A protein has these predicted regions:
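Bacterial Sec-dependent N-terminal signal peptides
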Residues: 1-21
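Generic secondary-structure transition motif, activating predominantly at the C-termini of alpha-helices
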Residues: 9, 130-133
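Active-site-proximal alpha-helix that buttresses catalytic centers in soluble enzyme cores
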Residues: 19-108, 122-123, 132-147, 152-170
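A glycine-rich beta-strand to alpha-helix segment
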Residues: 109-129
Length: 170
């Protein structure tokens, strides 16, 4: 009788240990293009005050999620979105340049992952991870509050979307 009960319990443990969760977000709010600093920095806009708050909220949301890897593009707004969580859990931020390479690396690693991207890359990352079109188009310019969650279990991918922080306004 003990063996019969032990087998299902063991299979559940093995199944759970093979599931990985990838959290994908767009960088938090950046300073507006009308700001004089934005004009000087053109392509590498820093986070606004609202963006700094959202980055802290992201840290609070994901601190207990056993993140082992964090990836960001090489811009200050993506790095600074990931930075509070990175410091909190002592996981360094890896820089990615190519989405296909990033997805390949994520699929080969063990552990949960945070990826910080841009309005025009988040959809591509999620869709390539799931192997399906889960996000049909680039995010809107004002969308900063989406937390996309991809669970990988063997060759299967499961997707859901949550909101975090204050709602984004158009």
């Amino acid at each position: 009788m003990k063996r019969i009960l032990l087998l299902p319990a063991l299979s559940m443990i093995l199944l759970c240990s093979c599931t990985r969760t990838i959290y994908v977000v767009r960088h938090a709010e950046k300073i507006g293009a009308t700001d004089s600093l934005a004009k000087m920095m053109a392509n590498d806009l820093p986070l606004s005050e609202a963006g700094k708050v959202r980055a802290i909220v992201l840290k609070e949301q994901l601190s207990g999620q056993h993140i082992k890897w964090i990836y960001s593009t090489n811009t200050s707004r993506t790095i600074n979105t990931a930075d509070p969580l990175s410091k909190s859990i002592n996981v360094s931020i890896g820089i990615y340049r190519n989405i296909d390479s990033l997805v390949s690396v994520i699929r080969s690693e063990k552990g949960n992952v945070l990826v910080v991207g841009h309005s025009n890359t988040v959809d591509d990352i999620v869709n390539k991870l799931t192997g399906q079109t889960k996000i049909a188009a680039d995010l809107k310019d004002y969308e900063y509050d989406n937390l996309f969650i991809v669970k990988l279990r063997g060759k299967k991918a499961f997707f859901r979307q949550r909101k975090y922080g204050y709602p984004s306004n158009p």
